[in-house]
Amino acid sequence: TPGATAPGSPAARAVGAHGHWLLPPTGELTPAIVARAIAARVSRLHDSATIRDRLAFLDAKEAELARPRLAASRTPWFCSGCPHNQSTKVPRDSYAVAGVGCHLMSVWMGRNTTTIAQMGGEGVNWLGIAGHTGTRHVFANMGDGTYYHSGLLAIRAAVAARVDITYKLLYNDAVAMTGGQPVDGPITVPQITRQLAAEGVERIVVLAEDPHKYPRDAGFAPGVQVRPREDLDAVQRELREQPGVTVLVY
């Protein structure tokens, strides 16, 4: 470029000015890609057996990685005993949208579950779709860890948008997808119901393995029902008829 260098200094050399890329403009830049680009430039000025050996090593490693392998195929599935096995099911004539977490696997389990959202965006895609489809209501899956992290904002957005949606909060007290760590922060089922009620959720139902373990003074928000897990299908059919945002804590 004129004026870019001091008088008497070597002229600058532009690489890629005519569409010949030194490095790929898109995708991943691996150490091997960068090493080959540097070696190609150096080879114009200096020939080295060491450089040739290192390039041959990189070629051999990548060829080994690219070699086809025969392996048994196993589709991922929920762990035995995980509540997601049941909680991600919806009535046959209903639909659900997926989110971040192990429950994402319900997308390929024939459970009328589609789409993927980022963490904290569960159900938000429905806010844009709802006004352009004949479908009145959907379910949205959300884990308890996601809820505490950022999922509550998605529910708040749904309340503000006045759409018909039922969030299924899949409470398993663990971040199972990354090793079973406990969920950060204090987050009990009664606390969740009080927070949701304060956000303007129309109706909240808790499905518990043993509803009797929750006494009357457990601290649930007013009007919250606690029912057995066996009522899942019936409760979902009730909630989908309720206008506005509803929540099922499973």
Where do the PLM segments sit?
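General beta-strand structural signal in soluble alpha/beta enzymes
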Residues: A14-A17, D53, A96-G99, A140-N141, ...
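Cofactor-pocket helix-loop regions in the catalytic cores of large enzyme subunits
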Residues: V42, H46-M109, H149
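Thiamine diphosphate
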Residues: N85-K89, Y95-M177, D184-P190
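Conserved active-site and cofactor/substrate-binding residues in soluble primary-metabolism enzymes
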Residues: P25-A37, R74-W77, C82-K89, G120-V124, ...
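Terminal amphipathic helices with adjacent charged low-complexity linkers/tails
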Residues: T1-D53
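Gly-rich Lys/Arg/Thr-decorated short loops/hinges at beta-loop-alpha junctions or inter-strand turns
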Residues: A14-A17, A66-T75, H103-N112, T135, ...
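Hydrophobic alpha-helical scaffolding
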Residues: T1, G16-A32, A72, W77-H84, ...
